[in-house]
């Protein structure tokens, strides 16, 4: 499952979003001449009919066409690829030049111009019907090849305001396939008082000076200047989302904070690279309330969160509605490795809302939860660790990492678990189909066929051995203002991370099922336990060079070394970390299927998954490096770009560290998990804590929760846990944080220091290592791949120790 932030549309786009380039649609409108063939006129200087075009003599019937007006209907086949880009024959060109062309109707419904916008025409040029007037009309075909909108001095399309544009028409000589172009001015179309794009989104109108400012942003601005530019425009849009309400109405919990308090806060926050008090308040951040003596009484958590908008930088010169990642395609070996180690997990649970008999009651809605005895939930998890057998046989006890809100679905009601992963050595640059309907994926299903022991068997095989709940030395309530302590006294902190143990040795032969492309596979594999587990894990234990590692730093304290430059030439020289994410969302928002594919998979989206990565959407239709006809230069360019990973998003709403794009403090900027506090199946609520990252181009649908974020060395950075709708990014929990001292800005609260794998932070009390230490405290001979020397802190590699812990 995937927690979401607000779905509310960010209609008032930021000014820089308005700087997105608009591509002009060029759609051929082929026309068919319904009249009988009319022979070309043979010029007087060619009496022997020796035309260079081998034309026949004209007859008297030709005269009938000479002064008529002829409608050109869609349907006449003219292959645009067959046109000849040379001047028409000399004897024909004067006739073509004399032709007059006009618009007969703008679409198939013959809608008047006043009821259409220029944007309505842009994607439907093939519906425009033309009329030709002149001589020898049967010799020619006309079609609209281009629509040229009006532009302002910043090169923005402003036809939505002017209602005016120019149609570029090709008049084609049918015999020679040569053509001339003419232009038709069109006007009187529906107008808008503001600029809107073809999707109906409002965009900020700019001028040449603003364009220059954007150029300066990329080429001259430092991090602080970029943050100031982005934040100023973002706040305009954000306040519009609040209907320009006063701060006292947006955040009544902060009504006692004076201007003196704010001024003091702003002075210190600026020195720390943080936003002003008022801006943080509008963004829904956790903020201090003060005592009469100016000291901080404690913090106040916002009751209502605003919607978030995208970053214009992330979407610059791209389709911002597609900046969600790349579906069903592996571009490079790093994604391939992650695909071999990452699983789509599905839990089948008893439905607590089910009422026997409701499934047959026609009066109850078909999608009512009470009709279904079982419920299914999906997430993403990946191989974390395994217990090393003493006899050096292939491991049977494995540990998988995922989000807490995914692992929480594994509980006393779970009757079955399905693990789906890519088969070993999956192909690169080859589009897959839906995960459940593709031979490159295999589904391993575990569950008892006996109704009386289904949940018991699952609980014996699967266990959640670590949850990052109440993992810090202090509770959230310790930082809150006095007036909120009682309200939040029972809410502990959490990081969205958990570890699931799977003991495959406990699975009985008849509790296995194997499916690939909706067909049973691996007949008899359940009789060979070692081979089965080796197959399921893609031989992970024997591939030491592919096994995961963990970074021993964080990007807040090492931002300068890992801040990818914006300009392409600079990025090609960049040696810092690049980011790779891979998960399995439901295919509901997989927009990459073609019309033919859609027909094949129609009806399967809601119950199937698509492999998803944070690669650029543009690569889906890039020519393959092996494709015939592609130049060597293009092949080399594509190959180089496809090896690259992603970078941090410039989304500024969640970015609590203003001059460090992609870096955020969860407790301050997003204490909720979605729009509410995280609630586990036992009804306990938790407040989000820890360091968070925001990767660009990763906004998959539900099911991708638990996706790992790694660098180019296959070192794990964190786990993706929250989709932030329409922002081209999401929230990733950092598994390691060096902490950050706010110098008293938020009272006693500072970003905590922790390492959720190795447990070496000064502010934490639990970790995966400590969970294993407790689990095996009476078994000194147990070792795992990550902890080959034991589980005590003294055995941890020194590179994971903090200098000031």
Descriptions of predicted regions:
Residues 36-81:
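Ser/Thr/Gly/Pro-rich low-complexity, disordered linker/stalk segments of secreted
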Residues 71-805:
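Terminal presequence/propeptide segments associated with secretion/organelle targeting
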Residues 8, 53, 60-62, 119, ...:
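Serine/proline-rich low-complexity intrinsically disordered segments, especially terminal tails, linkers
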Residues 3, 8, 31, 35-38, ...:
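Short, intrinsically disordered low-complexity segments
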Residues 1-46, 167-169:
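Gram-positive Sec-dependent secretion signals
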């Amino acid at each position: 499952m995937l927690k979401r932030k607000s779905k509310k549309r960010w209609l008032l786009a930021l000014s820089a979003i308005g700087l997105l380039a608009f591509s002009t649609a060029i759609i051929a409108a082929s026309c068919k001449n319904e009249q009988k063939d009319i022979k070309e006129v043979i010029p007087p200087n060619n009496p022997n009919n020796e035309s260079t075009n081998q034309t026949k003599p004209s007859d008297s019937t030709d005269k009938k066409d000479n002064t008529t007006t002829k409608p050109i209907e869609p349907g006449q086949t003219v292959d645009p690829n067959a046109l000849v880009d040379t001047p028409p024959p000399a004897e024909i060109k004067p006739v073509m030049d004399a032709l007059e062309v006009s618009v007969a109707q703008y679409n198939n419904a013959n809608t008047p111009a006043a009821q259409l916008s220029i944007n309505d025409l842009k994607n439907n040029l093939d519906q425009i019907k033309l009329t030709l007037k002149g001589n020898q009309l049967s010799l020619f075909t006309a079609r609209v090849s281009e629509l040229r909108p009006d532009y302002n001095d910043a090169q923005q399309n402003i036809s939505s305001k002017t209602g005016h544009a120019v149609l570029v028409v090709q008049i084609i000589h049918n015999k020679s396939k040569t053509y001339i172009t003419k232009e038709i001015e069109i006007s009187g179309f529906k107008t808008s008082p503001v600029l809107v794009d073809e999707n109906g989104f409002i965009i900020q109108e700019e001028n040449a000076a603003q364009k220059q400012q954007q150029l300066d942003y990329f080429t001259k601005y430092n991090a602080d200047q970029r943050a100031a530019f982005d934040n100023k425009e973002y706040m305009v849009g954000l306040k519009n989302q609040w209907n320009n309400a006063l701060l006292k109405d947006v955040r009544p919990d902060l009504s006692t904070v004076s201007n003196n308090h704010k001024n003091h806060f702003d002075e210190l926050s600026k020195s720390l690279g943080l936003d002003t008090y008022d801006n943080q308040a509008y963004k829904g951040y956790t903020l201090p309330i003060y005592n009469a003596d100016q000291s901080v009484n404690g913090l106040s958590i916002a009751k209502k969160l605003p919607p978030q908008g995208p970053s214009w930088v992330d979407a610059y010169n791209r389709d911002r509605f597609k900046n969600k990642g790349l579906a069903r395609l592996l571009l490079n070996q790093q994604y391939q490795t992650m695909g071999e180690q990452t699983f789509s997990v599905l839990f089948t649970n008893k439905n607590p809302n089910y009422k026997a008999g409701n499934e047959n009651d026609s009066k109850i809605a078909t999608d009512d939860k009470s009709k279904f005895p079982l419920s299914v939930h999906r997430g993403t998890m990946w191989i974390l660790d395994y217990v090393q057998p003493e006899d050096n046989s292939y491991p049977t006890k494995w540990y998988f990492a995922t989000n807490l809100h995914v692992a929480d679905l594994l509980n006393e009601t779970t009757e079955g678990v399905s693990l789906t992963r890519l088969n070993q050595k999956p192909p690169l640059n080859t589009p897959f189909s839906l995960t459940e309907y593709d031979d490159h994926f295999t589904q391993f299903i575990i569950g008892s066929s006996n109704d009386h022991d289904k949940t018991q068997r699952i609980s014996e095989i699967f266990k959640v051995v670590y949850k990052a709940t109440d993992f810090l030395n202090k509770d959230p309530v310790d930082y809150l203002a006095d007036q909120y302590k009682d309200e939040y006294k029972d809410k502990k902190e959490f990081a969205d991370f958990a570890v699931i143990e799977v003991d495959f040795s406990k699975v009985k032969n008849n509790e296995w099922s194997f499916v690939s492309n909706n067909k049973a596979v691996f007949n008899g594999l359940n009789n060979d336990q070692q081979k089965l587990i080796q197959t399921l894990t893609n031989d992970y234990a024997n591939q030491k060079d592919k096994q995961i590692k963990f970074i021993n730093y964080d990007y807040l304290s090492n931002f300068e070394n890992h801040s990818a430059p914006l300009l392409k030439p600079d990025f090609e020289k960049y040696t810092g970390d690049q980011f790779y994410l891979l998960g399995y969302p439901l295919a509901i928002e997989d927009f990459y299927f073609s019309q033919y594919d859609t027909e094949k998979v129609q009806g399967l989206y809601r119950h199937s998954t698509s492999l998803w990565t944070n690669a650029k959407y543009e690569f889906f239709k890039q020519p393959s490096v092996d494709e015939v006809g592609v130049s060597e230069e293009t092949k080399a360019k594509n190959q180089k770009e496809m090896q690259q990973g992603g970078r941090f998003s410039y989304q500024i709403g969640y970015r609590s560290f203003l001059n460090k794009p992609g870096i955020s403090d969860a407790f301050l900027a997003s204490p909720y998990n979605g729009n509410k506090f995280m609630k586990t199946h036992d009804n306990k609520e938790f407040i989000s804590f820890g360091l968070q990252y925001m990767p660009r181009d990763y906004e998959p649908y539900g099911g991708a929760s638990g996706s790992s974020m790694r660098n180019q060395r296959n070192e794990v950075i964190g786990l993706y846990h929250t989709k932030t709708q329409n922002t081209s990014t999401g929230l990733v929990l950092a598994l390691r944080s060096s902490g950050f001292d706010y110098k008293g800005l938020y009272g006693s609260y500072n970003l905590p220091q922790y390492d959720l794998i190795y447990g070496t932070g000064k502010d934490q009390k639990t970790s995966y290592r400590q969970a294993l230490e407790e689990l095996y405290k009476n078994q000194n001979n147990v070792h795992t791949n990550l902890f080959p020397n034991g589980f005590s802190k003294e055995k941890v590699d020194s590179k994971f120790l903090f200098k000031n812990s």
